[in-house]
């Protein structure tokens, strides 16, 4: 769907984006993560055709020349004419994107229904809450049925209920198009994304599948629970270190690798212990993200 190779953007003596390369596949949701100033918004604006890259290649559906009719874009702070109603604004936006008046009216009702604003279609935008404006921006980005949707911090201004609803919309949208979104809300990325791209100082620090990222950054911390008493016996194992007992039958500790975990389970069986829980600590995306950006 989208291929980015060696993308760079410079402003005089400042390199905002340095040699960025990644791919977004059809019906895939990719999260672009990174601290403030990492180059996320600049990258998204180049992909949307709003900024020209200093160098590098962007291909959409194999074509170097971006067809902006195939792209939907929601900026972090969407701007509206406050005196317009949602219906008027979407008609205006649709006509600018080349839709006929009749087609606009057909699509507007559908989009307002999808984003949950159908009851506010004739209310002036100046009276909208921040969350309602974000939804209207999403409706505008989807009006012309793009193949590739770019969302810059789409849930940053929303309350928990609004955030959940927008994430639910994103899950539905990726069935029909490719989605690339930036966010600081790492838990939200964990809910909807297939791939992650982590940027730092204008460069990519890591990219790939979320599960692969977690596995690469995983610690060797394990939890073991048994019906019997662990205390005293566990210390005898030379491959077990940093033991912390939650209670006499449950402990958290470190092992050098998963093979040591298998050895420990074998020792438990030989000892006649009844294992009720044995698991390796799974890190959240936030834990992994902090490791990558502070590396």
From Swiss-Prot:
<feature type="domain" description="ABC transporter">
    <location>
        <begin position="2"/>
        <end position="226"/>
    </location>
</feature>
<dbReference type="InterPro" id="IPR025302">
    <property type="entry name" value="DrrA1-3-like_C"/>
</dbReference>
<comment type="similarity">
    <text>Belongs to the ABC transporter superfamily.</text>
</comment>
<dbReference type="InterPro" id="IPR027417">
    <property type="entry name" value="P-loop_NTPase"/>
</dbReference>
<dbReference type="InterPro" id="IPR003593">
    <property type="entry name" value="AAA+_ATPase"/>
</dbReference>
<keyword id="KW-0547">Nucleotide-binding</keyword>
<dbReference type="GO" id="GO:0005524">
    <property type="term" value="F:ATP binding"/>
</dbReference>
<keyword id="KW-0813">Transport</keyword>
<dbReference type="GO" id="GO:0016887">
    <property type="term" value="F:ATP hydrolysis activity"/>
</dbReference>
<dbReference type="Pfam" id="PF00005">
    <property type="entry name" value="ABC_tran"/>
</dbReference>
<dbReference type="InterPro" id="IPR017871">
    <property type="entry name" value="ABC_transporter-like_CS"/>
</dbReference>
<feature type="binding site">
    <location>
        <begin position="34"/>
        <end position="41"/>
    </location>
    <ligand>
        <name>ATP</name>
    </ligand>
</feature>
<protein>
    <recommendedName>
        <fullName>Uncharacterized ABC transporter ATP-binding protein YxlF</fullName>
        <ecNumber>7.-.-.-</ecNumber>
    </recommendedName>
</protein>
<keyword id="KW-1278">Translocase</keyword>
<dbReference type="Pfam" id="PF13732">
    <property type="entry name" value="DrrA1-3_C"/>
</dbReference>
<keyword id="KW-0067">ATP-binding</keyword>
<dbReference type="InterPro" id="IPR003439">
    <property type="entry name" value="ABC_transporter-like_ATP-bd"/>
</dbReference>
């Amino acid at each position: 769907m989208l291929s980015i190779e060696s993308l760079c953007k410079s402003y005089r003596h400042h390199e905002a984006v340095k040699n960025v390369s990644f791919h977004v596949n059809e019906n895939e949701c990719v999260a672009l993560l990174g601290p403030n100033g990492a180059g996320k918004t600049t990258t998204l604006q180049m992909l949307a055709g709003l900024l020209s890259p200093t160098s590098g290649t962007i291909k959409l559906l194999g074509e170097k020349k971006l067809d902006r009719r195939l792209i939907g874009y929601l900026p972090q702070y969407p701007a509206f004419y406050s005196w317009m109603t949602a219906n008027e604004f979407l008609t205006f936006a649709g006509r600018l994107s080349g839709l006929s008046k009749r087609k606009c009216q057909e699509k507007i009702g559908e989009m307002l229904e999808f984003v949950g604003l159908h009851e506010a279609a004739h209310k002036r935008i100046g009276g909208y809450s921040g969350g309602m404006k974000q939804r209207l921006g999403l409706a505008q980005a989807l009006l012309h049925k793009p193949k590739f949707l770019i969302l810059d911090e789409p849930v940053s201004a929303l309350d928990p209920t609004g955030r959940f609803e927008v994430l639910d919309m994103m899950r539905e949208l990726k069935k029909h198009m490719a989605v690339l979104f930036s966010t600081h809300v790492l838990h939200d990325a964990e809910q909807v994304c297939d791939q992650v791209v982590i940027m730092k100082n204008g460069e990519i620090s890591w990219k790939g599948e979320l599960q692969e990222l977690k596995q690469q950054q995983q610690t060797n911390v394990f939890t073991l629970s048994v019906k019997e008493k662990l205390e005293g016996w566990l210390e005898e194992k030379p491959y077990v270190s940093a033991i912390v007992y939650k209670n006499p039958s449950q402990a958290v500790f470190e092992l050098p690798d998963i093979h040591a975990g298998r050895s420990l389970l074998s020792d438990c069986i030989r000892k006649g212990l009844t294992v009720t829980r044995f698991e390796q600590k799974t890190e959240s995306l936030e834990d992994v993200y902090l490791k990558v950006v502070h590396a």
